[in-house]
Amino acid sequence: MTKDILILAVETSCDETSVSVIKNGRDILSNTVLSQIESHKRFGGVVPEVASRHHVEGITTTINEALVDADVSMEDIDAIAVTEGPGLIGALLIGVNAAKALAFAYDKPLIPVHHIAGHIYANHIEEPLTFPLIALIVSGGHTELVYMKDHLTFEVIGETRDDAVGEAYDKVARTIGLNYPGGPQVDRLAAEGEDTYSFPRVWLDKDSYDFSFSGLKSAVINQLHNQRQKNIPIIEANVATSFQNSVVEVLTFKAIQACKEYGVQRLIVAGGVASNKGLRQSLADQCKVNDIQLTIPSPKLCTDNAAMIGVAGHYLYQQGRFADLALNGHSNIDLEEYSAE
């Protein structure tokens, strides 16, 4: 009988302290998430120093809760997986040092995990990954298209040249007057409005899978500034709808085109913006038309969580990709360099 593999995973790359226990690469035995949204809301965004302090305060309790919820002890754990980057360096160091302490104290292998690899593997929890596939990464810090021909092989075929899509959402939300976090509020507001503005769709070079959202963001900001200067009423829902349609159209088109060019019949979506209802519907419609299998995690698995780190960690464990106690956090790590090849 094959022994179950239990991975204890730690995620502290931004403003969630999360610890999870994953069995055999798919089964979530626990997934404890300590959110800091209320602490950062008054600042209109994540404050790195505040995030780090909250991680320090919560990491030990979160580890203990995850073990209790999973009904396991550290002796049952086979390895410790931890996000080493990218992310806020102060926040990352809390999780990395906690994971190193556990690995040392209990003599367990230590597995460094790329944060974006974790988001990709969140899809595997609900529907096993099949290859080849295209992954659309949409989050506050990243917007990428990634081709994968097997587990842990990452070829970045497109990425943002300026703002990440989630960053653009938050800045537009602030301009409209919405509270942090702005992305979900723009999405909700977009469902109520009409596409009355001619905001740009930025396609860049012909056949390019890169993205650019700074021009769109600036167009929205300038439009609202001009209307306020002239005392022209602003219909916030229409701004949200027009902005979101511009974003979603470009993301959907490039993701579908990538699937066609690479001969792929599987598209997965990863990152916090993957919970956006407008994007989910657009991708679902176009994937149906083009006979492409679409997988998007449940909203609770789109945001930062340790379960996704544990799933990616399971496959790294199988490949024997361990780190020693000199492991450090890194604010930037290239996904392709992290690839198995």
Swiss-Prot record:
Provide the cofactor note recorded for this chain's UniProt entry.
Binds 1 Fe(2+) ion per subunit.
Keyword presence, Kinase: no
| Classification via PROSITE patterns | GLYCOPROTEASE (PS01016)
Q: What is its main location?
A: cytoplasm
Family from the record: Belongs to the KAE1 / TsaD family.
Where is Fe cation bound in this sequence? 115, 119, 304
Q: Enumerate the GO terms in the molecular function aspect.
A: iron ion binding; N(6)-L-threonylcarbamoyladenine synthase activity
Give the NCBIfam families listed for this entry.
gcp_kae1 (TIGR00329), T6A_TsaD_YgjD (TIGR03723)
Q: Which cofactor does it need?
A: Fe(2+)
Q: Which InterPro entries match?
A: ATPase_NBD (IPR043129), Gcp-like_dom (IPR000905), KAE1/TsaD (IPR017861), Peptidase_M22_CS (IPR017860), TsaD (IPR022450)
Q: What does this protein do?
A: Required for the formation of a threonylcarbamoyl group on adenosine at position 37 (t(6)A37) in tRNAs that read codons beginning with adenine. Is involved in the transfer of the threonylcarbamoyl moiety of threonylcarbamoyl-AMP (TC-AMP) to the N6 group of A37, together with TsaE and TsaB. TsaD likely plays a direct catalytic role in this reaction.
Which residues does the record give as substrate binding sites? 137-141, 170, 183, 187, 276
**What are its GO biological-process terms?**
tRNA threonylcarbamoyladenosine modification
Q: Which GO terms describe its cellular component?
A: cytoplasm
Record field: catalytic activity: L-threonylcarbamoyladenylate + adenosine(37) in tRNA = N(6)-L-threonylcarbamoyladenosine(37) in tRNA + AMP + H(+)
The chain's coiled-coil residues are none
User: Which source organism?
Assistant: Staphylococcus aureus (strain MRSA252)
Which UniProt key words apply to this protein? Acyltransferase, Cytoplasm, Iron, Metal-binding, Transferase, tRNA processing
One Pfam annotation reads: TsaD
Entries under PANTHER family matching the protein: TRNA N6-ADENOSINE THREONYLCARBAMOYLTRANSFERASE (PTHR11735), TRNA N6-ADENOSINE THREONYLCARBAMOYLTRANSFERASE, MITOCHONDRIAL (PTHR11735:SF6)
User: Which gene is annotated as encoding this protein in its UniProt record?
Assistant: tsaD
Task: Tell me the compartments it is located in.
Answer: Cytoplasm
Q: State what protein this is by name.
A: tRNA N6-adenosine threonylcarbamoyltransferase
Which domain of life does the protein's organism represent?
A: Bacteria
Matching entries from CDD domains are given as: ASKHA_NBD_TsaD_bac
